[in-house]
Amino acid sequence: MAKKKGEEQDFEEEPNFDDPEGFVDDVSDEELLGDFLRQKPCESDGVENVIVVDNIPVVGAARFPKLKGIIEKIFKNAGTIVNVHYPKDEEDNTKGYAFVEYKNQESAEEAVKSLNNYRLDKHYTLLVNRFADFQKYSDIPKEWSPPQPQPYKVQNDLYNFLLEADAQDQFCVVSETVPGSVQVQFCQNTQPEPTELLKRERFTDTYVKWSPKGTYIVTFHKQGVVVWGGSSFVKVNKFAHSNAQFVDISPCEQYLVTYGPNGQKIVIWDIRTGAEKRTFVSDGMSNASMLRWSHDDRYVARLVDSQIQIYDTTTFFLLDMKSIRVEGIRNFSWSPTDNIIAYWVAEEVDVPAKVTLMAIPKKTELRTKNLFNVADCKIHWQKSGDYLCVKVDRFSKSKKEKKDKKDSDVKFLGMFYNFEIFHMREKDIPVDSVEVKETILAFAWEPVGSKFSIIHGEPSSANVSFYETNKGQEPVLVKKLEKKVCGHLFWSPRGQFIVLANLQMGTFEFVDTNDFSIMKTGDHYRASEVEWDPTGRYVVTGTSGKAKEDQGYYMWSFQGRILKRVNLKNFMLFLWRPRPPTLLSDAKQKEILKNLKKYYSQFESKDRLRMTRASKELIEKRAKLREQFTEYRSKRVKEWEDQKKRRMQLRNNVDTDTLEADPDNVEEEIVEILVREDTTVIE
């Protein structure tokens, strides 16, 4: 209510905001105004965005525009360039260095990281440094003070898995426990039951991958990939590459390649140091953009615009500073044991297709094979590098079918197939040819040996042919298995044994190629993968993916006997841990095989002891489970008996615990079921 004019008004006393006597403010400006103070200008602003590029060519005014275009084209890949300054002398010549200013500090740091030691040509290698580093290095104190000694860090033994006394292999099982949570279980393949070594929840976001020799395992995450190793799988290194889709590891495990999504970069890393060695731009994840390694990690190559680009991994520069240009090249592949590249060139008008073997680093052509009427080629190296097979899809005639006014498709008619076999260990590399008229469904080399197998014909009734290749002789057909319903071939890594698989029906045939006897047949409904262990003793078939029922894996012996069935909900992947090549010489291996019989008694004795111990443990385990069940059942029976009075009250004092207790409420009904119907024809 308003007061009249002249009346005294009452106001509340204002609070006192003064600090009490002796008050000490312990809140710093950084805590109070942190966001604001971070925007405060400083002396290094602008300088952090500048880099210095040394060792650029010294040119005059006439050649300066070309030099400027080349330098700016190289450095714009690191970020947005604001300004480039080229100091010049009195005669208008450049002084051999330049200053490049980027939009932000991150771009400048990326330029230093990725373009330092960039090979401009065979005479000039660019040296890139941050401009701010000059001040840092000029402030180095004159008196040297020794660094503080760091405590010794015990390194994890990355090869511990090879010290297992009985040479039992390891494997990992990947499954999704809950949506978005992937579990990885590591096991030792002991008999009769595997031994769990480690189980990791949320170990990866998608899947895992072993390195070629089994030293490392790679996990995938949103921020990048992580490499693990050692007996307890500790972190060895992590590599920041957002949304990396998959990885590749070099044969000798020195380098890791991460592939980003379509249109993003491909990065080569040093596994041990974590250093970024080289980056490439992806062309949409086509097969041609994949990097391919030589057997010794010395070279890495890729196919770009009718050129094979081979990089020497000692510097990660192009070999001889230039690409190998091959017009019409379609694909290439390294030998698994030698620095030899095999590539094929498509057929042109009046120019035949050809397959060429080239030795690296000399780039000399070792062998060329001309081919006619070629639609496509597939290159298959034998694991030992002794043979190369080029599967050639050939046609009798072709015709063009127009898609629109500009484009047209080529349709091939009268298809037949040739297998060109190159004998790599013989003088002048002779080539033999095997012709097959029927459709080829699969091809596979025996990893250790001289045989190869082919599935040909109609999928519903195919034939499986086995050929033997010997030195100085043409391939010989040694066996033909007719009317087989299969589409995949899986050789044992030790040779001799092979699995003929039909993954659509889930049927498998185990064949011994010494006498081509079918040892066993089996089935695993909806099996989608087949994995041999490194020793060739066991085979695993797995069901995952779209199959919602019966997910899990079966383990078989090499003879086709099922050893165990494991049903696992949301099973994703089963992977054997690879092993490195043996250190024993061929002579030593032959000596061991020769004297193997005298070791049989030792092995059999050890196996019996292990099985006896395992049986005893299994009996004890079952007895313990039986005891637990009996105890649990006794408790439940006692509880049920104690509740009888309450049940009687609920049922009008009628005992319904047994059928005989209340016969008036029991109805007897006879049901007839037709079990079998036999029909006898009387003449």
UniProtKB/Swiss-Prot annotation:
- In the record for this protein, the WD repeats are positioned at 199-238, 240-279, 283-321, 324-359, 435-477, 522-567
What's the name of its gene? eIF3-S9
Q: Which regions form coiled coils?
A: 611-638
Subcellular location(s) per record: Cytoplasm
The UniProt entry, under HAMAP family, shows: eIF3b
What does this chain do?
RNA-binding component of the eukaryotic translation initiation factor 3 (eIF-3) complex, which is involved in protein synthesis of a specialized repertoire of mRNAs and, together with other initiation factors, stimulates binding of mRNA and methionyl-tRNAi to the 40S ribosome. The eIF-3 complex specifically targets and initiates translation of a subset of mRNAs involved in cell proliferation.
Which residues lie in Acidic residues bias regions? 9-25
User: Which Pfam families does this chain map to?
Assistant: eIF2A, RRM_1
> What GO CC annotations are associated with the protein?
eukaryotic 43S preinitiation complex; eukaryotic 48S preinitiation complex; eukaryotic translation initiation factor 3 complex
Name the record gives this protein? Eukaryotic translation initiation factor 3 subunit B
Query: What PROSITE patterns is this protein classified in?
Result: RRM (PS50102)
- Region annotation Disordered: residue ranges? 1-25
Check the record and name the SUPFAM superfamilies matching this protein. RNA-binding domain, RBD, Tricorn protease domain 2
Q: Name one GO biological process term.
A: regulation of translational initiation
Q: Which family does it belong to?
A: Belongs to the eIF-3 subunit B family.
Per UniProt, subunit arrangement is: Component of the eukaryotic translation initiation factor 3 (eIF-3) complex.
Question: What sequence ranges are listed for the domain RRM?
Answer: 49-133
Alphabetically ordered keywords of this record: Coiled coil, Cytoplasm, Initiation factor, Protein biosynthesis, Repeat, RNA-binding, WD repeat
PANTHER family annotated for this entry? EUKARYOTIC TRANSLATION INITIATION FACTOR 3 EIF3 -RELATED, EUKARYOTIC TRANSLATION INITIATION FACTOR 3 SUBUNIT B
List, alphabetically, the InterPro entries matched: EIF3B, eIF3B_RRM, Nucleotide-bd_a/b_plait_sf, RBD_domain_sf, RRM_dom, TIF_beta_prop-like, WD40/YVTN_repeat-like_dom_sf
| GO molecular-function terms, A-Z | RNA binding; translation initiation factor activity; translation initiation factor binding
